[in-house]
């Protein structure tokens, strides 16, 4: 049963029933079965493209995975971008059970999250007033939104102290993202899933920072799990690749396994970790995650060996590895002498999810961590967000990062009102696009909008929306040299792809137009020279787009009127309906976070996993 309390089909039927009762329609889209006979399905709110992926060793398990993750994100209000509505509640991320606290109140609470916040700034011993001043100077978004110096904070239950604590949402979301969000058939099953994700990413970060040489998982040990061994042997049949299963348990403490696939003679490889208290399931997850949305051998395109360890410890590199598996891992992982010996993790085959959840929480507390859990099961499907300060951070946020996100909010407002983009404020767009240029899933212009439908962002489909917008901002400033640099960057990235030749010709014509403007500084003269090099259709487009540099963005990006009209589109209404169902569910089924301790039967005096 994979430590599932009910069968996967029962889970799917239950969740489909909840969606039907809420009149939320979803689409199921199956991807091609992988060469390992694993399955991937996409669950989306009908017509919107917004949803989650499911994966598994059978179609039933993949469906259950997809629907469970859908509810995990849905109940945590992390399902796509937030709809812009008039209610002030949207400014608080949609959660109704929070409270507005002053900086003084947050700092006086002195919980583990706030302590870590100031320790990361070398302000652990700073005066109370200095901490207040620092917090206010960095967290200005709330003031911009509400014209108030208060910070909307959500309740979490602290298992160590046995009480509810409030964390400022705009602070902790940047630290933790969706890490530790979980769902399951029971509260205990969900908690085990959430803790497994936290441990997996904690170990993944240790691979970057400690750079251990990993021991092999012995083949005799893998044979204890026949379906894992079968997949392992199937992969090894392909002589073009080398396949390894590595132990990441750090001496048997953490049930984490790594699947490494190397494309021979190229330097390319991929690493995928999996975690679960049952080590067979941990290995299985490494396989199924690596096949999500692709054949498993395509996973080698995630990393290349680099003996300089360039950017290995960079926060963006580590975050990218969490999000989509793309990242530069330290070459030391491939060392022949392991940093620790393989040691089997504890056998949990006779334990229940309740016992595992209880003992894991005890273990974290014994290691000196606080375990903070927020129950969001408003649709009566157990879902939570677990935060372990000092362990579950996706990144350690600096004051600079918070200020960048403040600026991102400003840039979003400018893009919603493109006619207000001027010489004076393009610098904010340029700086923000540059900051996120290497951040996977964040280097997308459409992320600066709420839900978009039938609106095309130039070069977004090719993954080049950010550098293109940056180039247009430089053109507004008549800085043709920097605009040329961005357009040349785009051309170099797309020239070898299988794309419409007209698209490539268009970006090339822009490149030569900009190079002409660098020298000639005259729009008409530049076009005259290019007339002998490009077809008339490209010359006409260049003339129409660039005759007035100040209007190049207005001509290409959606206007505020277009964006407002999107609210009349059927698919926008579907997403808005889902969001309002989430609001209604909170009102109908409010949750007292103090009840979490009863839900998972936590007993601080009883340790069953030693």
Regions found by a protein language model. Name each.
Residues 1-610:
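Helix-biased "structured C-terminal domain" signature
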């Amino acid at each position: 049963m994979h430590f599932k309390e009910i069968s996967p089909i029962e889970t799917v039927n239950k969740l489909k029933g909840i969606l039907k009762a809420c009149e939320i329609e979803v689409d199921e889209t199956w991807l091609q079965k992988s060469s390992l006979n694993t399955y991937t399905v996409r669950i989306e709110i009908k017509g919107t493209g917004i949803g989650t992926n499911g994966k598994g060793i059978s179609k039933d398990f993949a469906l259950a995975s997809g629907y469970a993750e859908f509810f995990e994100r849905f109940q945590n209000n992390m399902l796509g971008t937030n709809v812009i509505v008039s209610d002030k509640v949207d400014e608080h991320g949609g959660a109704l059970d929070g409270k507005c606290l002053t900086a003084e109140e947050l700092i006086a609470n002195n919980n583990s999250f706030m302590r870590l916040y100031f320790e990361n700034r070398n302000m652990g011993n700073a005066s109370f007033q200095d901490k207040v001043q620092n917090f206010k100077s960095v967290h200005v978004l709330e003031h911009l939104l509400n014209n108030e110096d208060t910070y909307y904070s959500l309740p979490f239950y602290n298992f160590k102290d046995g009480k509810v604590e409030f964390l400022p949402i705009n602070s902790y979301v940047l630290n933790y993202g969706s890490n530790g969000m979980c769902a399951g058939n029971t509260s205990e099953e969900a908690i085990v899933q959430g803790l497994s994700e936290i441990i997996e990413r904690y170990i993944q970060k240790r691979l970057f920072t400690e750079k251990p040489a990993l021991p092999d998982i012995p083949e005799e040990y893998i044979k204890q799990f026949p379906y894992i061994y079968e997949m392992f042997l199937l992969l090894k049949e392909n002589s073009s690749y080398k396949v390894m299963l590595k132990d990441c348990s750090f001496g048997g403490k953490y049930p984490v396994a790594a699947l490494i696939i190397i494309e021979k003679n190229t330097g390319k490889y991929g690493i995928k970790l999996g975690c679960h208290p049952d080590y067979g399931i941990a290995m299985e997850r490494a396989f199924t995650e690596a096949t999500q949305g692709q054949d498993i051998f395509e996973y080698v395109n995630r990393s290349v060996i680099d003996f300089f360890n360039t950017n290995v410890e960079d926060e963006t590199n580590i975050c990218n590895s969490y999000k989509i598996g793309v990242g530069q891992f330290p070459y030391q992982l491939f060392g022949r002498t392991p940093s620790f010996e393989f040691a089997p993790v504890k056998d949990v085959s006779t334990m229940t999810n309740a016992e595992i959840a209880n003992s894991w929480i005890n273990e974290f507390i014994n290691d000196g961590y606080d375990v903070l859990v927020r129950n969001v099961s408003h649709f009566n499907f157990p879902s939570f967000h677990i935060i372990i300060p000092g362990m579950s951070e996706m990144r350690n946020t600096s004051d600079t990062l918070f200020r960048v996100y403040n600026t991102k909010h400003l840039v979003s407002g400018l893009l919603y009102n493109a006619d207000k983009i001027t010489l004076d404020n393009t610098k904010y767009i340029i700086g923000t696009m540059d900051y996120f240029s290497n951040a996977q899933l964040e280097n997308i212009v459409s992320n600066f909008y709420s839900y978009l439908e039938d609106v095309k962002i130039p070069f977004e489909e090719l993954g080049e929306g950010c550098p293109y917008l940056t180039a247009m901002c430089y053109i507004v400033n008549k800085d043709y040299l920097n605009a040329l640099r961005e357009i040349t960057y785009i051309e170099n990235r797309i020239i070898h792809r299988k794309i419409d030749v007209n698209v490539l010709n268009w970006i090339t014509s822009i490149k030569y137009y900009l190079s002409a403007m660098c020298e000639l500084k005259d729009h008409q003269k530049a076009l005259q020279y290019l007339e002998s090099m490009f077809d008339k259709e490209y010359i006409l487009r260049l003339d129409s787009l660039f005759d007035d540099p100040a209007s190049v963005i207005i001509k290409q990006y959606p206007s505020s009127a277009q964006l407002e009209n999107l609210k009349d589109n059927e698919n926008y209404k579907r997403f808005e309906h889902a969001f309002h169902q989430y609001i209604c569910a909170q009102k109908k089924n409010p949750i007292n976070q103090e009840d979490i301790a009863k839900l998972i039967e936590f007993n601080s005096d009883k340790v069953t996993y030693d």
